[in-house]
Regions:
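Non-catalytic regulatory/interaction regions at protein termini and inter-domain linkers
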Residues: 1-215
């Protein structure tokens, strides 16, 4: 059973560790993510966007349509990547978390306020689609958010491509849920239940997931 005690007694990650839960075409969320990314660039953060090649191309186009100088941004401030840690192998949460913290350290060393990162969970876990380490990864990520105030970002959970348990877990480990470009809500299920959850809890989580997917 997953133990949240360390996280519950450490300083909160406030709204820096956010979750975007949705269904339908991922391209429909490009504008939302591009606005969030652009805001963080203006605030002085280096930004990382991790997704499939078509989605990375879509992000480039979306940012360009917002009058962002993509060529100049990609040189330093913005990292658009389709690289996966798994590369066909089993997902290694330790390697992924280590790379993320290395990028954060480098951003600070280069004079940025910190690192904003957004990754699609389906893409991050690679073609094997083995999500058995998802909770371990998210708990490790949340621990970094507690420890490193310079880190912020949005985890993307696509209902159409992730198993139900993965979607349920998304509601247990993110303090804030992104609704649209202007609205975010406090997640009422954050660190409230231990995993695996019982039938009654699953029903509560599934109800909220269904409501979020209507947005």
């Amino acid at each position: 059973m997953t133990d949240y005690s360390t996280l519950m007694h450490s300083p909160g990650s406030e709204s820096r560790h956010q979750c975007l839960i949705y269904n339908g075409a991922p391209s429909q969320k490009l504008s939302l993510l591009a606005r969030a990314l652009q805001t963080k660039l203006v605030e002085g953060y280096r930004c990382l966007y991790l997704n499939s090649p078509p989605m990375v191309a879509g992000m480039r186009s979306t940012l360009a349509s917002m009058d962002s100088d993509i060529a100049e941004l990609v040189k330093d401030s913005l990292i658009l990547s389709s690289d996966t840690v798994s590369s066909g192998k089993n997902f290694d949460s330790g390697v992924m978390l280590g790379k993320l913290e290395d990028l954060l350290d480098k951003a600070i060393k280069d004079g940025y306020k910190g690192l904003w990162a957004s990754g699609d969970m389906t893409w991050e876990f690679g073609p094997s689609k083995d999500f058995s380490k998802l909770m371990e990864y998210e708990l490790g990520l949340e621990e970094i958010f507690h420890r490193r105030k310079e880190l912020c970002g949005i985890c993307q959970y696509h209902h159409d491509t992730l198993p139900r348990d993965a979607m349920r877990q998304s509601l247990l480990i993110h303090p804030t849920v992104v609704i649209n470009e202007t609205l975010k809500i406090i997640n009422p299920h954050y660190l409230k239940f231990k995993w695996p959850t019982d039938i009654n809890t699953n029903q509560k989580l599934d109800k909220m997931l269904a409501e979020l997917c209507k947005q």
